[in-house]
Design a protein with these regions (language model features):
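Interfacial helix-loop-helix junctions of multi-pass membrane proteins
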Residues: 97-105, 153-184
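Outer-membrane beta-barrel architecture
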Residues: 128, 132, 178, 202-204
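Alpha-helical membrane-inserting segments
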Residues: 17, 87, 91, 95, ...
């Protein structure tokens, strides 16, 4: 839990320092961080988090099936991940915001179709994945809140690699959390309702 506290303190300090004189953007907090994407913050680690989370969520959904509490939560997480990916891509295309690495102006919007800074798709992705688990198990096991470390880590990493502005990260987290909470409230996950029972029943039941 000490590491969790350190991460939370770090992101709070990071956003507090955003209120510098040079900060701008829609909330007045955006500024480009000095590039420092090495070590724990390396781009490879960020991509590993993204890709491994996809494999884990899809794999566990297919293995456990939807008949158990945990299995159903994984399917809700799968739905959240897919819907968030579509929503994030559409939002990026609509707003076309320039990344910090492309220029030092957080107010550059609607410029080029290659500008896709807003919102942070990776932060939205990992937030959408963890939200159903927090919503489902928060009362049974408060330690599930430690999953919040993942989007916090990813958000800091994306800003340190100059891939996103502060408001990109906040918007991504809000998008992922919103979609995750919506899917958490559903009794039957979308995927389970659409896919054949032979897929959603769980491969572990076949062995």
């Amino acid at each position: 839990m000490n590491k969790l506290k350190q991460f939370i303190i770090q992101i709070i300090l990071l956003f507090c320092t955003s209120f510098a004189a040079e900060a701008s953007g829609p909330l007045g907090i955006d500024h480009r961080l000095t590039r420092a994407d090495t070590g724990i913050w390396s781009r490879n680690n960020q991509l590993f988090l993204e890709y491994s989370s996809v494999v884990l969520v899809l794999g566990e959904s297919l293995w456990l099936g939807s008949d158990t509490r945990l299995g159903k939560t994984f399917w809700k997480s799968t739905d959240s991940m897919i819907i968030t990916a579509v929503g994030s891509a559409a939002t990026k295309e609509a707003f076309r915001r320039e990344r910090p690495s492309q220029g030092n102006d957080p107010n550059t919007w609607f410029k080029s179709s290659t500008d896709r800074s807003f919102p942070s798709g990776e932060v939205a992705h990992i937030t959408a994945i963890i939200t159903p688990f927090i919503a489902e198990y928060k009362n049974d096991n408060p330690f599930v809140w430690s999953l919040a470390v993942l989007p916090i880590y990813d958000g800091i990493g994306r800003m340190k690699s100059q891939g996103h502005w502060q408001t990109d990260v906040l918007a991504g987290a809000a998008l992922g959390a919103g979609i995750g909470l919506y899917n958490s409230s559903r009794d039957t996950p979308f995927s389970v309702a659409i896919l054949p029972n032979t897929i959603t029943i769980g491969f572990n039941k076949r062995f």
